[in-house]
């Protein structure tokens, strides 16, 4: 699993580096986090968490600063979080998290993306019960046992720690992700490849041929929607 995360991060970072839509999505997320609390990330842990993720995706500093400055202003623009669940070809499943200023527009767009690209929308809970909500942290290292002990000493609810090919992957209870990050930073870890709340599939499916092509198109259309923040799937490699 550790190598999987590293591979996904490498692929995502390469794509994000040239993708202005990703920058815009992080801009919205940073704005919302700053608007809900203090616009200073040192006193707003939710904002700091989003900024750290943005930096991992190589979002330029001026995009981050612009979103924070917007939150400091008098704008009354509001955004609503949403979650949609659905099915793709041959046992594939997707969970789509959105952040939008127009819920009706977003719902229609997500439904159309599924319907026009070989998928179909499901009811709330039709997919998510087959996924586990976890905090995921990935960083360079070798000694998984030492990291596990360190997190236990910091009273972190840690599910598992894996080491593979120089990369350590930590899985925590979602409520303890921030605590785990703080504990690891205090131990001297300065750079993280991943710090995310994830919906992890309990089992994965492998697609090939036309099924894979159909799924890739569906995933791409959803990913390109400006209101879609994250997509979780049970398809291997995504």
UniProtKB/Swiss-Prot annotation:
GO terms for molecular function: DNA binding. GO terms for biological process: regulation of DNA-templated transcription. Its main location: cytoplasm. InterPro entries: Integrase-like_N (IPR017856), TACO1_YebC-like_2nd/3rd_dom (IPR048300), TACO1_YebC_N (IPR049083), Transcrip_reg_TACO1-like (IPR002876), Transcrip_reg_TACO1-like_dom3 (IPR026564), Transcrip_reg_TACO1_YeeN (IPR026562), YebC-like (IPR029072). Signal peptide: none annotated. It holds the Pfam family Transcrip_reg. It is found in: Cytoplasm. PANTHER family: TRANSLATIONAL ACTIVATOR OF CYTOCHROME C OXIDASE 1 (PTHR12532:SF0). NCBIfam families: PRK00110.1, PRK12378.1, YebC/PmpR family DNA-binding transcriptional regulator. This is Probable transcriptional regulatory protein SP_1922. It comes from Streptococcus pneumoniae serotype 4 (strain ATCC BAA-334 / TIGR4).
